[in-house]
């Protein structure tokens, strides 16, 4: 039995099949994403979605979808599916689906009368090329396939509508055509492995609707351009490969290329393998060979904080240390440029956020544990030292080392932590002053840097850092630990935030912590009682004021809920780490039960990955981005920790 397989009953029930999405990426920034019944429900959905750096830094939907029609004895059966206004779906091709399986590659089996047609999809690695293989498994009569492409040529942030500006020009290429709707865009090549006839009959399909955008309070409909259709006969047992790309390909190579791409795919036959596949989808390799971690799909770009938090789990936890080095090399170059006040040459957003250097050291600490401190010192010791010096010299524009040894930051006017939602131009959660995880990270960084200095034989520097850490530890306890046994979220003069928030889990989970064992247990206990859900830790306790756990509605409504009670799986990773460190093997069964909630997500929402956040109340529905790097990373890291404690 396949791990990710759905039968006819589910596939033909749109209430069950439409919420399930599927993502494929090329590891260079392009992706293909839709629902498992190929009905686009978001403006971000498309069969071929690619970066167009000549225009902007967004992805662009070139090919929205490809409708296939089976023709026998003059009767036509369209396998496509689109939603139009008024809850109208057409042409209802999902009713022909018999099963869907995506253990290795997404495979859909259609049955139309005596015809059984199999469709398999792969996205070629490092190329802007989607490949679809059609196989006529059975057919008792002469069969013709008609392919009708729906084109958008627009940013994922926008919509397209019928207009007179769009070019209808096209040129014949090897077994296909190339076309480009607007200046500045690359040509779209649509080719087949078999000779075909292209019928030019341009038309606009009007009023295609995307219900997910409607739910999010945005405009939700557009018009899609269809230049015509391709037709060809297909015999029983025959395969035809379709390619959509921004470059031409020799069509005689398509079948071998498809086989090669399939052979390179790892099966998604269990929870771990699904997460490994998801981890690879966040990879982005640029033409200059810079490597990045994308924060999530379908709308996030590369962000500095997300990169350093996600990097260990997405690489070290799946034994891909080399990719850690490649990403760290790129990120390190960018952060050194930032520290030296030079133009940033890498494509990493939010590199100026004050906790970024602290998370960078945390990531390198994980590298040291996975390899060795000697290896880390050799490759990254200088970078750690540079960061410590930079912070101590108060050169960061929004991070000040105070005389008490704590780090102070100004977050009143602009969000400066991972709780970064804003409304009306101001932070919804104005975390400012002494921020609990910033200072836990700082203490951890000082101790780790001291350990590296000791290995280097620099005893003077080691003792200096340890003395600084001791001062930070005492000030941390004096500032954050309250009479009820948990930690204030932030403190700024007389302003003390008593809210029970998950940021206090970090000093419990870190290798170097200012908290004693008893203090850690009290903090963990409160997190368990008030914040823990099957999908991670809530961003705010239900007992705290302003609890707003359901992430739905227009932008402003969602912004106010974003960090006010929603649950975040990546925080659950740190929670599980803290639990295992404190209670070791006695918590194994408890942590294994926690993993069930994350494994359930493999067959919901975006298959084989984990959504950005979840409602904080049952049934803990997945929301936000359909695949989120920090969530996948921290669950992978927790799985690795779980395995280490089991043996």
Which residue ranges define each predicted feature?
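Non-catalytic C-terminal accessory modules of carbohydrate-active enzymes
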Residues: 78-105, 112-116, 393, 525-535, ...
């Amino acid at each position: 039995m396949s791990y990710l397989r759905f039968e006819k009953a589910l596939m033909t029930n749109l209430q069950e099949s439409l919420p399930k999405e599927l993502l494929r990426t090329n590891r260079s920034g392009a992706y293909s994403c839709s629902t498992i019944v190929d009905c686009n429900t978001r403006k971000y959905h498309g069969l071929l979605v690619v970066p167009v750096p000549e225009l902007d830094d967004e992805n662009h939907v070139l090919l929205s979808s490809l409708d296939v029609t089976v023709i026998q004895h003059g009767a036509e059966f369209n396998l496509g599916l689109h939603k139009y206004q008024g809850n109208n779906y057409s042409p209802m091709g999902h009713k022909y689906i018999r099963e869907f399986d995506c253990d290795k590659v997404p495979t859909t089996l259609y049955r139309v009368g005596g015809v059984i047609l199999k469709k398999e999809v792969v996205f070629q690695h490092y190329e802007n090329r989607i490949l679809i293989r059609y196989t006529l498994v059975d057919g008792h009569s002469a069969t013709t396939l008609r392919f009708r492409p729906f084109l958008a040529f627009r940013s994922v942030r926008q919509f397209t509508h019928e207009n007179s500006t769009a070019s209808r020009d096209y040129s014949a290429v090897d077994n296909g055509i190339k076309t480009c709707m607007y200046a500045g865009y690359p040509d779209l090549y649509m080719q087949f492995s078999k000779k075909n006839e292209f019928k030019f009959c341009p038309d606009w399909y009007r009023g295609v609707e995307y219900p997910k955008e409607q739910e999010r309070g945005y405009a939700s409909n557009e018009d899609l351009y269809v230049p015509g259709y391709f037709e060809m006969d297909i015999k029983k047992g025959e395969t035809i490969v379709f390619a959509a790309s921004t470059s031409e390909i020799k069509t005689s190579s398509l079948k071998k290329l498809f086989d090669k791409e399939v052979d390179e795919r790892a099966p998604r036959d269990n929870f771990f393998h699904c997460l490994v596949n998801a981890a690879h989808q966040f990879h982005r390799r640029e033409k200059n060979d810079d490597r990045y971690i994308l924060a999530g799909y379908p709308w996030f770009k590369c962000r500095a904080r997300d990169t350093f938090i996600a990097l260990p789990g997405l690489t070290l936890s799946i034994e891909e240390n080399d990719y850690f080095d490649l990403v760290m090399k790129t990120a390190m170059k960018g952060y050194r440029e930032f520290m030296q006040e030079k133009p940033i040459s890498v494509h990493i957003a939010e590199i100026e956020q004050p906790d970024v250097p602290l998370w960078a050291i945390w990531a390198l600490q994980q590298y040291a544990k996975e390899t060795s401190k000697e290896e880390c010192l050799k490759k990254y010791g200088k970078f750690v030292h540079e960061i410590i010096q930079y912070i101590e010299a108060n050169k960061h524009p929004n991070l000040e080392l105070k005389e008490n040894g704590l780090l102070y930051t100004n977050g009143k006017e602009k969000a400066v932590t991972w709780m970064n939602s804003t409304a009306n131009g101001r932070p919804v959660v104005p975390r400012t002053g002494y921020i609990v995880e910033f200072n836990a990270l700082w203490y951890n960084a000082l101790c780790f840097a001291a350990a590296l200095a000791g290995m280097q034989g620099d005893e003077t520097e080691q003792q200096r850092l340890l003395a600084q850490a001791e001062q930070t530890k005492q000030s941390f306890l004096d500032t954050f630990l309250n009479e009820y046994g948990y930690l204030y979220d932030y403190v700024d003069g007389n302003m003390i935030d008593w809210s029970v928030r998950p940021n206090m889990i970090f000093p419990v989970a870190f290798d170097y912590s200012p908290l004693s064992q008893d203090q850690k247990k009290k903090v963990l206990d409160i997190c368990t009682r008030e914040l823990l859900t099957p999908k991670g830790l809530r961003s705010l306790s239900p007992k705290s004021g302003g609890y707003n756990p359901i992430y739905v509605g227009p932008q402003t409504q969602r912004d106010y809920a974003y960090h006010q009670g929603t649950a975040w799986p990546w925080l659950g990773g740190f929670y599980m780490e803290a639990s295992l460190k404190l209670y070791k093997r006695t918590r194994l069964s408890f942590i294994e039960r926690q993993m069930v909630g994350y494994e359930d997500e493999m067959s919901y929402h975006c298959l084989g990955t984990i959504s950005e956040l979840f409602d904080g109340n049952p049934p803990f529905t997945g929301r936000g981005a359909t695949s989120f790097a920090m969530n996948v990373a921290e669950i992978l890291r927790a799985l690795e920790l779980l395995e280490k404690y089991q043996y």
